[in-house]
């Protein structure tokens, strides 16, 4: 079988493979780009593996950068876009269950491929498109199956993050996990505690937005990986409930986290801080969960306080929780608000001061009451109508 290499990212990198081969070494496309190209998915980073050692790559090409030379990776810059070329290697013991204690450069493609995580990621492609498949990766791609290369227990002891990658790929690609590989995840789930929260979160985030979220979550639960993830151990019931929701692919990470946290009935700040998520995500999920608590019939003030992003996110989550929920009606209700932020309010504190109102708590309270009444439609958003009412409310004149 040959892979069509006319995609721009591959096509642009073919001269690099040819130049390495012309110097007497082997060079192949490897990794996720090969897998995704075979599946007909968009490809992203193109990785190249070679029998040439780093010093030899640097002699072959005029412009290079040492991006990870201790692990055999050199960035080749000769052809515009940089391409990482990594020397074939074997790895020794993994005492921290994440990084090898020692890396040895080798000349054998087979030795390099057998250390990889799953068979679908252990394919190599020559510059003419010829596919090298030493571990039946093509067969597993055909059957939509995730299977560890060689002994799965060894693969997960080498790098415990691979277990999270398995459930992430299950969701992202819509693949199933081969029974022996799944059993090995269950046997080794406790090793996940050795992996940094950031790395675990990166995989879980991608699981939440995959095309088969249910399958990924179900195996996350069945293999007990969840028990070793931040703040998840006590929430098997809610996680199971989450995994049973319709498998509609979510459009945003915030929707996934908001749905999960709403079902967990836990504080968004506590959970998301434990998972080391961004402040931006924490704010949006917090606003969304607050709105979900008054759904499906929020007031105009609820919608106004939530803001457009949280309304959109809550709408998607509510549709997941209640399939007959009318998202269009919610969108129209938000769009129909007289104002959508305080900046749009016709009355300001400066207007009140100019009218003789003393700055202070009374003025702030009056402005807040005016804002709420305008949002509710009880008052028109017109300065000439709002100013006398707010002035009277303040009752604290100069």
Curated annotation (Swiss-Prot):
One of its GO terms (molecular function) is ATP binding. Keywords: ATP-binding, Magnesium, Metal-binding, Nucleotide-binding, Nucleotidyltransferase, RNA repair, RNA-binding, Transferase, tRNA processing. It catalyses: a tRNA precursor + 2 CTP + ATP = a tRNA with a 3' CCA end + 3 diphosphate; a tRNA with a 3' CCA end + 2 CTP + ATP = a tRNA with a 3' CCACCA end + 3 diphosphate. It comes from the Bacteria. Its EC number is 2.7.7.72. SUPFAM superfamilies: Nucleotidyltransferase, Poly A polymerase C-terminal region-like. Mg(2+) binds at residues 45, 47. Pfam families: PolyA_pol, PolyA_pol_RNAbd, tRNA_NucTran2_2. One of its GO terms (biological process) is tRNA 3'-terminal CCA addition. Gene3D superfamilies: 1.10.246.80, 1.20.58.560, Beta Polymerase, domain 2, cca-adding enzyme, domain 2. ATP binds at residues 32, 35, 116, 159, 162, 165, 168. Coiled coil: none annotated. CTP binds at residues 32, 35, 116, 159, 162, 165, 168. The keyword Metal-binding applies. A single active site specifically recognizes both ATP and CTP and is responsible for their addition. Catalyzes the addition and repair of the essential 3'-terminal CCA sequence in tRNAs without using a nucleic acid template. Adds these three nucleotides in the order of C, C, and A to the tRNA nucleotide-73, using CTP and ATP as substrates and producing inorganic pyrophosphate. tRNA 3'-terminal CCA addition is required both for tRNA processing and repair. Also involved in tRNA surveillance by mediating tandem CCA addition to generate a CCACCA at the 3' terminus of unstable tRNAs. While stable tRNAs receive only 3'-terminal CCA, unstable tRNAs are marked with CCACCA and rapidly degraded. Belongs to the tRNA nucleotidyltransferase/poly(A) polymerase family. Bacterial CCA-adding enzyme type 3 subfamily. This is CCA-adding enzyme. It comes from Lacticaseibacillus paracasei (strain ATCC 334 / BCRC 17002 / CCUG 31169 / CIP 107868 / KCTC 3260 / NRRL B-441) (Lactobacillus paracasei).
